[in-house]
A protein has these predicted regions:
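Phosphate/dinucleotide-binding and metal-coordinating scaffold of catalytic cores
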Residues: 1-253, 257-258, 271-358
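Glycine-rich phosphate-binding P-loop
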Residues: 261
Length: 358
């Protein structure tokens, strides 16, 4: 059997279940999928392994809360392999709300226009499953054709409203409060960023943010871009600085100011133009539910975005300020810290550190 890896309505590669491969549009390949046209047995095995891993990554992360309930609902194993997870994702054509890639079988008569998730509605049954761990009936199993690949440890789901999709994130009141407070602070600085608001779902607090992707723009994680750069003899961080140094430095500044210790390589990356499959800048800064951690000293935690260098968050932020300035556009209102006076003192101390470094 041959699978066709699609970018919107264009076939970018064909791959058989034995690893035989033909790359049709190399410039439009997924950044984190490596396929090699070869008769070599080992390279063909690698093709199949890479393909199933890529498909599985478009499903859900197994450490995600309520993953068991989601897998139970579609009759999957509790401890699934990449291949099993890939088969689950393939049953929904590997669709995602993060990009416009999908997969179909050779000669399958189906179009992206007819199934893409940006234009076709989702069921509220999905929201229940993803956020609350409700058991889903077999008859609703097909409604899982949504984005379950947002990753992370916190329950989350995309919800369609009249003006587009919104991400609802659970994780408990404290995580929601941290994310919303961090968002209020970040808005006082000039930076492309996701705006988080507090809301309720089934009488529980959630943070709510609008989707940043569309049929025109996709999201590529740093992890995916690193795969691409590694296989094209490029230094990932150098390429990012060449593309959009201001956004990179603002990320390090804001993560330091709000004490975000969870800037791992899956929650920052590139915004890609789907017309060309080329990056245009870093995508909007997101994910602040682990803010105000290790927030009792000016140093902060180790910075996770500086490659192989060993820098504290303070050192990375000072370096950033010396490159681009602070870019504060308005004062942070003291009232946002009304319930956390200790955080207010630390924030002001860290802000002074950066102002003095300019």
């Amino acid at each position: 059997m041959f699978y066709e890896i699609m970018h919107r309505e264009s076939c970018v590669a064909q791959l058989s279940t034995t690893g035989e491969c033909r790359v049709c549009l190399e410039d439009f390949m997924p950044y984190d999928l490596v396929l090699v046209e070869s008769d070599d047995f080992d390279e063909r095995i690698n093709n199949v392994t890479n393909f199933y891993y890529w498909c599985a990554s478009r499903m859900l992360t197994l450490d995600r809360t309520y993953a068991k309930e989601i897998l139970n609902s579609i009759g999957a194993s509790q401890s699934v392999t990449d291949r099993e997870r890939a088969q689950i994702a393939l049953s929904y054509h590997c669709l995602s709300l993060l990009d416009v890639f999908w997969v179909k079988e050779e000669n399958e008569k189906i179009r992206f226009e007819d199934i893409n998730l940006f234009a076709h509605s989702l069921s509220n049954a999905l929201v229940d499953i993803a956020l609350r761990g409700h058991q889903m009936t077999v008859t609703n199993a097909h409604l899982l054709a949504n984005d379950l690949s947002t990753g992370g440890l916190y329950p989350k789901a995309w919800v369609r409203k009249e003006d587009g999709f919104y991400l609802y994130k659970d994780g408990g009141r404290e995580a929601v409060e941290r994310e919303v407070l961090a968002s209020k602070i970040c808005r006082c600085f000039d930076c492309h960023q996701v705006l988080y608001e507090q809301g309720m779902f089934e009488n529980e607090p959630v943070s709510i943010s609008k989707i940043m992707t569309s049929q025109r723009y996709s999201l590529v994680t740093y992890a995916a871009y690193d795969v691409y750069c590694t296989n094209h003899d490029g230094n990932t961080l150098d390429k990012i600085l060449e593309l959009d140094a201001p956004s990179y430095y603002m990320m390090n500044i804001l993560d330091y100011l709000v004490g975000n210790t969870d800037r791992h390589w899956e929650n920052w990356g590139l915004l890609v133009d789907n017309e060309t499959n080329q990056p245009i800048r870093l995508h909007d800064l997101m994910d602040f539910n682990r803010s105000f951690q290790q927030y009792d000293t000016p140093e902060g935690a180790n910075c996770l975005t500086v490659g192989k260098r060993h820098l504290s968050q303070k050192d990375a932020a000072v370096e950033a300020v010396r490159n681009i300035g602070l870019n504060q556009v308005r004062q942070v209102e003291h009232t946002v810290f009304s319930e956390h006076p200790a955080w207010k003192a630390t924030f002001e101390e860290r802000l002074r550190v950066l102002r003095n470094a300019m």
